[in-house]
């Protein structure tokens, strides 16, 4: 789960990482009030979960509260890379002497944690890595040993931070590691980490990604979810404990097991090339349980997507046998009733497949078409989607 900048900086501050005072506003009057409370020049910053805010006009300096109100009016509602700005952060303006970069992240490729640091901050780190790779220090972090002052010093030295700020940066690194671990994050990033004219180090901007798999021990994660920004179908699926990701196609996908679902996306995309370019509309893995309730919940979510023109149910019977899956589909269609109007292509294979096919055949539901092979079923689902588009 990605956080907004203001949420990230609140987490930083709670762990002792130095940040500037700020307040969030959802309208221009609130922005003016926040600027009045802070006093002096402020920066009005769009709160969206994407980069490039400055180039898009989403970050503006305001010299006084009235100007903060005007700048907030210009930013609120701004579309930044498809993200609509619904709130702004009003924060104290700061003069900047130098800009740096620092992050901790989960290094999935090496199954480890990684620290990345650079004295070339303030720009996209991908740009630094591409144009000046020697300016980006990467240090592997042992998850057992973690980051103490000595390890933080090693990181700071590797990145060649100036000696006059090294002690401050070491302290920030230790506290940022505490944030990373305590909050179950997969990314904590400060860009830029700045030095002000007084020589003080400040986290001027922040990015945090939290591991939602840790929500059972991080109850406050629920308070950080932005209900307005969440896709309504994904929110509905999440409420039903379904592993669902919305895509931009026309063929709804239900499968059991992430690998099978990913393969299904591929074969549907390939089949769609012959049928007006239709594509998969979602990823939905129902896992090992294909009960009537789970199947009904999955179909309810997928059929709620107006872009979906057909649904492909692709199940390989293992621990959950095909007859149980078939019964689940039949019961799900009864539960959904008149809502189950879009064509449903079902491919069953594996444990008790013949019994599963018999159950579906006897149910004789007008929306259901059975196809024996995965490629054939994908082709049929794509054909039906193209016809209904």
Swiss-Prot record:
<dbReference type="InterPro" id="IPR013815">
    <property type="entry name" value="ATP_grasp_subdomain_1"/>
</dbReference>
<dbReference type="GO" id="GO:0006104">
    <property type="term" value="P:succinyl-CoA metabolic process"/>
</dbReference>
<dbReference type="GO" id="GO:0004775">
    <property type="term" value="F:succinate-CoA ligase (ADP-forming) activity"/>
</dbReference>
<keyword id="KW-0436">Ligase</keyword>
<feature type="binding site">
    <location>
        <position position="99"/>
    </location>
    <ligand>
        <name>ATP</name>
    </ligand>
</feature>
<dbReference type="Pfam" id="PF08442">
    <property type="entry name" value="ATP-grasp_2"/>
</dbReference>
<feature type="domain" description="ATP-grasp">
    <location>
        <begin position="9"/>
        <end position="236"/>
    </location>
</feature>
<keyword id="KW-0479">Metal-binding</keyword>
<comment type="function">
    <text>Succinyl-CoA synthetase functions in the citric acid cycle (TCA), coupling the hydrolysis of succinyl-CoA to the synthesis of either ATP or GTP and thus represents the only step of substrate-level phosphorylation in the TCA. The beta subunit provides nucleotide specificity of the enzyme and binds the substrate succinate, while the binding sites for coenzyme A and phosphate are found in the alpha subunit.</text>
</comment>
<dbReference type="InterPro" id="IPR017866">
    <property type="entry name" value="Succ-CoA_synthase_bsu_CS"/>
</dbReference>
<feature type="binding site">
    <location>
        <begin position="52"/>
        <end position="54"/>
    </location>
    <ligand>
        <name>ATP</name>
    </ligand>
</feature>
<feature type="binding site">
    <location>
        <begin position="318"/>
        <end position="320"/>
    </location>
    <ligand>
        <name>substrate</name>
    </ligand>
</feature>
<dbReference type="GO" id="GO:0005524">
    <property type="term" value="F:ATP binding"/>
</dbReference>
<protein>
    <recommendedName>
        <fullName>Succinate--CoA ligase [ADP-forming] subunit beta</fullName>
        <ecNumber>6.2.1.5</ecNumber>
    </recommendedName>
</protein>
<dbReference type="InterPro" id="IPR013650">
    <property type="entry name" value="ATP-grasp_succ-CoA_synth-type"/>
</dbReference>
<dbReference type="GO" id="GO:0004776">
    <property type="term" value="F:succinate-CoA ligase (GDP-forming) activity"/>
</dbReference>
<feature type="binding site">
    <location>
        <position position="205"/>
    </location>
    <ligand>
        <name>Mg(2+)</name>
    </ligand>
</feature>
<dbReference type="InterPro" id="IPR005809">
    <property type="entry name" value="Succ_CoA_ligase-like_bsu"/>
</dbReference>
<dbReference type="InterPro" id="IPR011761">
    <property type="entry name" value="ATP-grasp"/>
</dbReference>
<feature type="binding site">
    <location>
        <position position="256"/>
    </location>
    <ligand>
        <name>substrate</name>
    </ligand>
</feature>
<keyword id="KW-0816">Tricarboxylic acid cycle</keyword>
<keyword id="KW-0067">ATP-binding</keyword>
<dbReference type="InterPro" id="IPR005811">
    <property type="entry name" value="SUCC_ACL_C"/>
</dbReference>
<keyword id="KW-0460">Magnesium</keyword>
<comment type="similarity">
    <text>Belongs to the succinate/malate CoA ligase beta subunit family.</text>
</comment>
<comment type="subunit">
    <text>Heterotetramer of two alpha and two beta subunits.</text>
</comment>
<dbReference type="GO" id="GO:0006099">
    <property type="term" value="P:tricarboxylic acid cycle"/>
</dbReference>
<dbReference type="GO" id="GO:0005829">
    <property type="term" value="C:cytosol"/>
</dbReference>
<dbReference type="Pfam" id="PF00549">
    <property type="entry name" value="Ligase_CoA"/>
</dbReference>
<dbReference type="GO" id="GO:0042709">
    <property type="term" value="C:succinate-CoA ligase complex"/>
</dbReference>
<feature type="binding site">
    <location>
        <position position="45"/>
    </location>
    <ligand>
        <name>ATP</name>
    </ligand>
</feature>
<comment type="pathway">
    <text>Carbohydrate metabolism; tricarboxylic acid cycle; succinate from succinyl-CoA (ligase route): step 1/1.</text>
</comment>
<dbReference type="GO" id="GO:0000287">
    <property type="term" value="F:magnesium ion binding"/>
</dbReference>
<dbReference type="InterPro" id="IPR016102">
    <property type="entry name" value="Succinyl-CoA_synth-like"/>
</dbReference>
<feature type="binding site">
    <location>
        <position position="94"/>
    </location>
    <ligand>
        <name>ATP</name>
    </ligand>
</feature>
<keyword id="KW-0547">Nucleotide-binding</keyword>
<feature type="binding site">
    <location>
        <position position="191"/>
    </location>
    <ligand>
        <name>Mg(2+)</name>
    </ligand>
</feature>
